[in-house]
Design a protein with these regions (language model features):
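Flexible, acidic/Gly-rich N-terminal and inter-domain linker regions that tether
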Residues: 1-70
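Local cysteine-cluster metal-coordination motifs and their immediate loop/turn environment
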Residues: 70-80
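Core AdoMet radical
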Residues: 81-96, 104-129, 135-156, 163-270, ...
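Short, acidic/polar
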Residues: 100, 159, 302-309
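Active-site glycine- and acidic-residue-rich loops that bind
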Residues: 152-153, 296-307
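Class I SAM-binding transferase module
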Residues: 285-287
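A conserved active-site cap/scaffold subdomain adjacent to cofactor or substrate pockets
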Residues: 309-318
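Conserved small/polar residues in nucleotide/adenosyl-binding loops
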Residues: 326-334
Length: 334
């Protein structure tokens, strides 16, 4: 694995980390309508309405970037895997905040999409991402749209914090079956992915009820009226996929999985301040959560992909299940 390059300018880091994020799918309607607030910067009303799309799928109205493309994992389908010889860089929280604000002031972007490789361990990486979001919302008074991809295996407190500081959260499903996950992403498991996904779904539902909304996310168009919709749990068909599918690993939202997690240390960086100052009256991920699956890396049929998506929609009330085409450009030749 290449070492992180030191002495890079912010522009050089941006070139590396924006390019490294191009295989993350983020482009969709934001799902929130928060208006501008006096004394704050930005709003989320127009996000998701006037997006432009680059040829490689990037959404140009969001700054789509990684916190770091360093990664301790070696997922065979990933450009940033440990064994791949690519330039590595890492943003510091304040450095990334400055970049977001300057881009926003120049009307380049309407918001931020933040993902990351894994530096040291999942909790350390998630802490750096939360520090960035916390500084944006407090020090920089940024009120625009934020979509953050959480890191499976990070501490529950930090994943929860990300929900309070962002508009949409994601936990990448990665692959539709356990067999493919074991083969192509041996450091990951359905348990470490579905556990935070379930807890996020539970918290989102509780916050929606607290403000007088239905527990489930609203669906648009004809999906609100179709009894047999893919989202409708009351009229669902059998979603089980045998021994390999997600339904056999589904955790009840809010339940505790058996995954090992590193714990955030109270004295680390901004953690004490963030936990103390976090405004839990803020809406929790008001635009819901989404996920992403790689399609074509394993031997799954279209039927399996659709059934997996249906199970995720019904069990975790996801707003979107994105499918990203497997590409040899990012893949391990093995």
């Amino acid at each position: 694995m290449s070492e992180i390059i030191t002495g890079l300018t912010t522009k050089e880091k941006l070139n590396i980390l924006a390019d490294a994020a191009k295989y993350d799918v983020a482009c969709t309607s934001s799902g929130v309508d928060r208006k501008g607030v006096k004394g704050s910067l930005g709003n989320s009303v127009s996000c998701g309405i006037c997006h432009s799309f680059a040829g490689d799928g990037r959404c140009v109205s969001l700054l789509k970037v990684l916190m770091t493309n360093h990664c301790i994992f070696d997922c065979k389908y990933c450009l940033n895997r440990r064994s791949n010889d690519v330039p590595r860089a890492t943003f510091e929280p304040d450095e990334l905040c400055d970049l977001v604000i300057e881009f926003y002031k120049r009307n380049y972007i309407e918001g931020l999409f933040l993902s990351s490789g894994i530096l040291r361990d999942p909790t350390y990486t998630m802490q750096k991402m939360c520090e960035t979001l916390y500084l944006l919302r407090t020090k920089y008074r940024f009120n625009g749209y934020i979509h953050v991809k959480t890191i499976p295996g990070a501490s529950d407190d930090l994943i929860s914090m990300a929900g309070y500081l962002s508009d949409r959260v994601s936990v990448n499903m990665e692959l539709p079956t356990d067999e493919s996950l074991r083969k192509l992403a041996p450091n990951k498991s359905f348990t470490t992915i579905l556990d935070p996904m379930g807890k996020l779904a539970n918290t989102i539902g509780a916050h929606r009820i607290a403000v007088g909304k239905s527990e489930k996310m609203e669906r648009s168009g004809i999906n609100r009226y179709l009894a047999g919709s893919i989202f409708n749990t009351d009229h669902s068909t059998d979603c089980r996929l045998g021994d390999r599918g997600v339904d056999n690993y589904s955790l009840i939202p809010g339940s505790s999985g058996s995954s090992e997690k590193t714990v955030a240390k109270p004295a680390d960086g901004l953690l004490p301040v963030m936990f103390h100052d976090l405004d839990r009256r803020r809406p929790f991920a008001p635009a819901g959560q989404s996920t992403q699956m790689i399609v074509g890396a394993g031997e799954e049929t279209d039927y399996t992909l659709i059934r997996t998506a249906q199970t995720l929609y019904q069990n975790y009330d996801l707003k979107r299940v994105f499918c990203l085409l497997y590409t040899s450009d990012a893949a391990d030749e093995e």
